[in-house]
Amino acid sequence: MTKIMEMSSSELIQSIQSGKLKICVIGIGRIGLPTALSFANSGLPTVGVDINSELVTSINSGMFPLKDEPGYGTIFENMIKEKKFTATTKIEEAVPQCDVILLSLPTPMDQNNVPNYSALKSVGKQLHDLLTSGSLVIVESTIEPGFVENELISIIEGDRSRLHAGNNFGIGVCPETANPGQILNDFERLPRLVGAIDDKIANIITKIYKHVFTVDLIPMPDCKTANAVKLTTNVFRDINIAFVNELAMLFEKLGIDIMKVLEAAKTKYNFQVHYPGAGVGGPCLPVNSYQMLNLAKSANSNLLKIVEVSRRVNESMPEHVVSLLKEGFEESGKKLEKIGRAHV
């Protein structure tokens, strides 16, 4: 393997273009697997690591698990056939053999809506023992601003007797920006943010991602700013959806069609339209809003009350939609049976 942190710019480019750079993606789920396939498809040998042994066995048997992701089925078949991508549960074998370690791990909420970074912290502890000097770590997971600088680096470094960030290993972020069901399309059109602990590492990450993706790469001054941008874009949507949801409920009482209002309003050039509904389009936005609220709390701030209120509004919408359906069914003499709920 190469020592990516010690390469000159020309040596790095040659290593990338010749396919000598080895990639390890830790966490090959909904986003991690397409990410790994994109790197492999660019000519960089890639290994995916996951604790789900059934998933790993299925992948290595040639079975693509993400049937609802257009375009990646064919890429998967080709990468498996050409042996450019493999999967394993053995992180201890994969990490020491790779130059770049991508972290695409889940960051869910606990029962109190507090971000749970246990997966990232656990992998960080393993990297402390497994990471080879000269390697590069890139966090793609959506995390709170400051997590890399304040927690993850110290976990990987330990007592600094072997590893020292910015000295003999690099670390940065490139938050994923893709929606399930259209990941390949999003990877090909949505700009990516690049942040790192110093400019040299940011430039290395940019060169690697330019080889894999054709989108614009936007340089950020550091990791926390890049992560702040990712959260801000999603929390912005959550807040605006809450606003139109409350408008919709008000207009119901006044006999005004919210859709006609929005269609006319969006003819104004600076109006960014959002639509009411039972949810906000999946699990990511709620998680990101709670991450932002946790960030404010950790800063001993009472700010962002608007985010907290917006979450309450949007979380109440499924019941409101059910009540509207119930009214409609009762008026028509029919019954409505509520069986369960899922994120929408």
Regions found by a protein language model. Give the residues of each.
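Structural/interface elements that position substrates and couple domains in central-metabolism enzymes
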Residues: T2-R341
